[in-house]
Amino acid sequence: MPYQRDTLYDTPQAVVDFRFDERTAAVFPDMIHRSVPGYATLLQLFAVIGAGFVPEGGHVYDLGCALGGASIALQRHIPQSATIDAVDNAEAMTRRLAAYVEGAGISNIRVQQADITALDYRPADLIIMAFTLQFIPPEARDALLVRLRQTLRPGGALLLAEKTRPDDDRMRQWHEAFKAAQGYSQMAIAQKRESLENVMQTDRAVTIETRLQQAGFTRIEPCFRALQFCGWVASV
């Protein structure tokens, strides 16, 4: 998928709340790979782990799909008779993903612009949420996880990845050092951090695991960690 280099915060500006708009969509692949350590590995892990939960004719949700990185990786590993509903509330993201899917001739990914907290879910074998829950208001997270648990068929799983809130400041410093090593300036890092303050509210890892347990997931297994970026397989 064509994309530009992320320079959104390279110049001094009056910082506004981060939005998944056209400007973000145009640079998103570069942004997320340079901002999330191990992102490519996470997508590969979710694809190979997730494929084990998807049977012939199975059904998958990719919630908060953005430009469909997880969906595109997964569809190479699952039966062609299985379908993936890639859902995001950002029109700029879904429009680009729909155009890519059509142009690439990928027939088993269906793209939908919708609010995942109000979606009319149908039974699924696998649900993927990669760095999505952190953008849902904290007071709505438990109810959403309960709905997802109820959506999954017996033997199904939720693959969840989140940026977690560390217990001290060292992890933030290490993450910002990682971003600097990817070519982001200190000004860009600071302005991006400020833009996310009112938009992304992270939980501690233990809080996320508690939310999953209380939602009714019976087996919760960590499968990924790079700095404060974590992934879990939550099975039913």
Please give the residue ranges for each predicted region.
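Conserved beta-strand signature within the Rossmann-like core of class I S-adenosyl-L-methionine
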Residues: 155-162
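C-terminal alpha-helical "lid/dimerization" subdomain adjacent to the S-adenosyl-L-methionine
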Residues: 163-214
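Conserved alpha-helix/loop element of class I SAM-dependent methyltransferases that forms part
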Residues: 38-56
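Class I SAM-dependent methyltransferase SAM/SAH-binding core
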Residues: 61, 70-117
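A short glycine-rich, Lys/Arg-flanked "PGG" loop and its adjoining helix->strand segment in the class I
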Residues: 142-154
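Conserved class I S-adenosyl-L-methionine
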Residues: 57-66
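A short SAM/SAH-binding and catalytic strip from SAM-dependent methyltransferases
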Residues: 125-140
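A short acidic, Gly/Pro-enriched loop at the edge of an enzyme's catalytic core
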Residues: 117-127
